[in-house]
Amino acid sequence: MQEKGKCPVTGMTKHKTSGGTTNQDWWPNQLNLKMLHQNPTMRNPMGERFNYAEEFKKLDFEALKNDLYALMTDSQEWWPADYGHYGPLFIRMAWHSAGTYRMGDGRGGAGTGNQRFAPLNSWPDNVNLDKARRLLWPIKQKYGKKISWADLMILAGNCALESMGFKTFGFAGGREDIWEPEEDIYWGQENEWLGDKRYSGDRELENPLAAVQMGLIYVNPEGPNGQPSALASGKDIRDTFARMAMNDEETVALVAGGHTFGKCHGAGSATHVGPEPEAANIEEQGLGWKNSMGSGKGIHTISSGIEGAWTPTPIKWDNSYLDTLFNYDWDLVKSPAGAWQWVPTDPTAADSVPDAHDPSKRHAPMMTTADLALRMDPIYGPIAKGFRENPEAFADAFGRAWFKLTHRDMGPRTRFLGPEVPTEELIWQDPVPAVDFELIDEDDITGLKGKIIDSGLSLSELVSTAWASASSFRGSDKRGGANGARIRLAPQKDWEVNQPEQLQTVLQALEKIQDTFNSAQSGKKRISLADLIVLAGCAGVEQAAKNAGFDVCVPFTPGRTDASQEQTEVESFSVLEPMADGFRNYSKGKYTISAEKLLVDRTQLLGLTAPEMTVLVGGMRVLNANYNKSQQGVLTKRPENLTNDFFVNLLDMDTAWKVTAEGGDMFEGIDRKTGELKWTGTGVDLVFGSNSELRAIAEVYASDDAKQKFVEDFVTAWNKVMNADRFDLA
């Protein structure tokens, strides 16, 4: 007889794919190395050879836009369009796709199509956006691999604006879809929707978060924690939008521009609304929030709980939002769903807004508490009034802010695809000059390497400077990196981690080599300082390998240029300053998060794997490239020799490790037999012997037959970091 609960084919216990106690349950503080291996090719149905950029170039862009325009007014019975136009719904979808971006760590945003997956597809703030994506499905189905979901959602928002009379600033494609939820994005510590444990002290929001509550994109529209105070809401809005890289003018333009269109939905109590998509029954086929009130759609729709439109013309671009905001005084009321909102005190406004589905009905406009902040806040108010008096300035500001919102996480313009990419260079895109000179060749590279090695700079100085320049890159929003040589500019030149005094010495020596080389050229051949910094690091690695007995050539590809201070927004770049860099054994202060976890986080931002992280840390230690030449973790008697000594000595069982007398994250390696001090290290060093997964990798590099493999793997990982921002090489 078949044993109960067993699979009749394999005998596997049922529910093996879910439930059960996981390693993370047993050991909650365990390092999450999965975040270093997200979206592997085996999860991607497009295959390893798929090139999205090439497929996008084959797209009939105008035909796609025409199909999107047609969809805007093709109301479907299963989810009828408000006012006969889906435009406002698609604007909200695009906005909420892009609006998860936060500049603190560059994560979130529209660049991956992650709104399709948990948790975002089930956030309270994204109620009924599942319907927007289903409305888009026939178009996605038609164009297939030529347009990603990530690009399509943003383009749909643009087409929505255009179909309602707004001229957009532009559109760029190039967002490639992911195929599973991200492991690396910290959305908050709360374990219930709309929780706000992220605040401490005097309403200080936890970094790097930007949204005020779990499951919201920005702020609570009813006011902080649902309390209807416009002034308090203004403070929340300013903090949140600033963390999403928007200044006050951009914030007012975005809110006023976005709320020019559509309406909010709160026809009845939230008790009518069923579970979100991830919790819905299988027969719902990925749709959530099934509504038991009336028809469950149209006039009975329940989304935010707020009910009504902002303007008399909800599907037309005009100044009516600002006119409505300033023309009336406002009374606080509750919506049919019980949410706080505001309506005009003037009774003549009661029939100024059309009904979204019944032409025989009229309504008063409404405003949320967050809307009133644009009028009541002492900074936002004058900006909003100025936009009201100058509609052209308002339209320009909204167009630019919308483009920034929807493209902020895409990185430099070299990644932008399509016929509608704006020609204007925008400061937030971190521009670098175009290459207007002849690049150096192999003979030049060889000669320059010799000059660098003979310059008097130590190998550790060459390596640490190149690392400082290139490792500023973060793959989340494609910012930073060696291109531009911004390490010589504010703010990077003054970052503590970059050792400003040593940095200036190295830069002066390299600039002298650069000037000598460029002055000797009769033609247009030049080397940029950005290239020379990287080349110097490569020369240092090569020499260190040679010192260890290995003859290797570290790859180098010229083509970087030098940005100016005018092309560098200091405040914007300040968020790239590392609070910790385990590769250099650096920490700016003491944090509640362990140094090991910060190392993994930085590794993920650099786009590195666990083996690459391991080999780089081991190599940087023996190259003596620590911050301030600290000897923590320099587990070698042969510094500046590219050996596997770090791993050999870390895993040596003749050494016992203990916390130093000072405690904290400092450790001493003691000879078990003599009791003598052999080494010192940090948690970042010891984790490669402590963590079982990292130890498994470290054992590979500590093996007797791995000396050459270590060098080769270090060079490969080094080259990856040096070229992390070279999208022109892709």
From Swiss-Prot:
Region of interest: Disordered: 1-24
Cross-referenced Pfam families: peroxidase
Residues that coordinate or bind heme b: 259
Cofactor(s) for this UniProt protein: heme b
PTM comment, free text: Formation of the three residue Trp-Tyr-Met cross-link is important for the catalase, but not the peroxidase activity of the enzyme.
GO cellular component: cytosol
CDD domains: catalase_peroxidase_1 (cd00649), catalase_peroxidase_2 (cd08200)
Cofactor binding description: Binds 1 heme b (iron(II)-protoporphyrin IX) group per dimer.
Enzyme class, UniProt record, top EC level: oxidoreductase
Keyword Coiled coil: no
Active-site residue numbers: 96 (proton acceptor)
InterPro entries the record matches: Catalase_peroxidase (IPR000763), Haem_peroxidase (IPR002016), Haem_peroxidase_sf (IPR010255), Peroxidases_AS (IPR019794), Peroxidases_heam-ligand_BS (IPR019793)
GO biological process: cellular response to hydrogen peroxide; hydrogen peroxide catabolic process
Catalyzed reaction equations: H2O2 + AH2 = A + 2 H2O; 2 H2O2 = O2 + 2 H2O
Keywords (A to Z) from UniProt: Heme, Hydrogen peroxide, Iron, Metal-binding, Oxidoreductase, Peroxidase
Protein family per UniProt: Belongs to the peroxidase family. Peroxidase/catalase subfamily.
Subunit structure, as described in the record: Homodimer or homotetramer.
HAMAP family: Catal_peroxid
Alphabetized PANTHER family for the sequence: CATALASE-PEROXIDASE (PTHR30555:SF0), HYDROPEROXIDASE I, BIFUNCTIONAL CATALASE-PEROXIDASE (PTHR30555)
UniProt-recorded name of the protein: Catalase-peroxidase 1
Gene: katG1
